[in-house]
Amino acid sequence: HFNAPSHIRRKIMSSPLSKELRQKYNVRSMPIRKDDEVQVVRGHYKGQQIGKVVQVYRKKYVIYIERVQREKANGTTVHVGIHPSKVVITRLKLDKDRKKILERKAKSRQVGKEKGKYKEETIEKMQE
């Protein structure tokens, strides 16, 4: 992944969706994007209030979040880079393309459930 091109880095930089969004869309994770709202769940800044993604820095594999910043020695504040796997998305910025992706992912999950090892009828027969 050190010399992965940008379009593959996008995929690597995915974040899990919050429990509510997971229920709503039937999708587990999504590549992160600039105006998503996220909550940090690991590391020094975890548990802080929800913040908006200010920048997605693919070269460094980090995202910068609105309120996650620190003060430099000279007094200026800078954003702290956080890896996307350490946040959960609490609100998605939806446009038509992103909706399409969600529908596509949800559809493939449905297919996966139908492809399960046992159907309900066979389970009922086994219990008899």
Swiss-Prot record:
InterPro entries for this protein: KOW, Rib_uL2_dom2, Ribosomal_uL24_CS, Ribosomal_uL24_euk/arc, Ribosomal_uL24_KOW, Translation_prot_SH3-like_sf
Keywords: Cytoplasm, Ribonucleoprotein, Ribosomal protein
Pfam families: KOW, Ribosomal_L26
Record GO cellular component, one term: cytosolic large ribosomal subunit
GO terms under biological process: cytoplasmic translation; ribosomal large subunit biogenesis
Annotated stretches, region: Disordered: 105-128
Keyword 4Fe-4S in annotation: no
A GO MF label: structural constituent of ribosome
Its biological purpose: Component of the large ribosomal subunit. The ribosome is a large ribonucleoprotein complex responsible for the synthesis of proteins in the cell.
Family membership: Belongs to the universal ribosomal protein uL24 family.
Listed name of the protein: Large ribosomal subunit protein uL24
Biological source species: Gallus gallus (Chicken)
Phylogenetic placement of the source organism: Eukaryota, Metazoa, Chordata, Craniata, Vertebrata
Gene that this sequence comes from: RPL26
